[in-house]
Curated annotation (Swiss-Prot):
This is FMN-dependent NADH:quinone oxidoreductase. FMN binds at residues 10, 16-18, 96-99, 140-145. It comes from Salmonella typhimurium (strain LT2 / SGSC1412 / ATCC 700720). Keywords: Flavoprotein, FMN, NAD, Oxidoreductase. Belongs to the azoreductase type 1 family. SUPFAM superfamilies: Flavoproteins.
């Protein structure tokens, strides 16, 4: 049995293209992997705090006592990291907002990137500590960006996930959503076909 963690990040709720793809992924995964456990964390509906000057102090060991706000942030960071490490497959819904991932998803990454816990520095360079995972990224875009200089999402996610130890990453794209109903429908259909292949793998 595998455990699947699904991270939603769209602010568009039911209108979200990435959200629809995520729901389709969950539906197909449950159908093909009946015994697996799926956990869904909606980072837009339940956002994590922005890492600011106060909160970053909670993520670094020190002698100074933590403020209540720092204590809460550290406890949440510990919870998110434990959740991440406890799952085998990580599904990340990453719609493109102004050429990048949603703020809500970036805030999550900022809370799980902790030296000595999800990565460490060695004489040979950084080493990821979140290993043995498989990641699937579902990315919807209004325009066409895949394999072009305007796609900042795929390279960024490859680097970040690899940095913490997740190197098995599959991307599913739904592009041209804003180009009209026909293009959007084809993009969704193609993305669902790609999801079917990922789920079956």
């Amino acid at each position: 049995m595998s455990k699947v963690l699904v991270l939603k990040s769209s602010i568009l709720a039911g209108y979200s293209q990435s959200g629809q793809l995520t729901d389709y992924f969950i539906e197909q995964w449950r159908e093909k992997h009946v015994a697996d456990e799926i956990t869904v964390r909606d980072l837009a509906a339940n956002p994590v705090p922005v890492l600011d000057g106060e909160l970053v102090g909670a993520m670094r060991p020190g002698d100074a006592p933590l403020t209540p706000r720092q204590q809460d942030a550290l406890a949440l960071s510990d919870e998110l990291i434990a959740e991440l490490k406890a799952h085998d497959v990580i599904v990340i819904a990453a719609p493109m907002y102004n050429f990048n991932i949603p703020t809500q998803l970036k805030n999550y990454f900022d809370l799980i990137a902790r030296a000595g816990i999800t990565f460490r520095y060695t004489e040979k360079g950084p080493e990821g500590l979140v290993t043995g995972k498989r990641a699937v990224v579902l990315s919807s875009r209004g325009g066409i960006h895949k394999d072009t200089p305007t796609d900042l999402i795929a390279p960024y996610l490859k680097v970040f996930l690899g940095f913490i130890g997740i190197t098995d990453v599959n991307f599913v794209f739904a592009e041209g959503i804003a180009y009209g109903p026909e293009v959007a429908a084809k993009a969704q259909a193609d993305a669902k076909a790609a999801i079917d292949s990922v789920v079956a793998a």
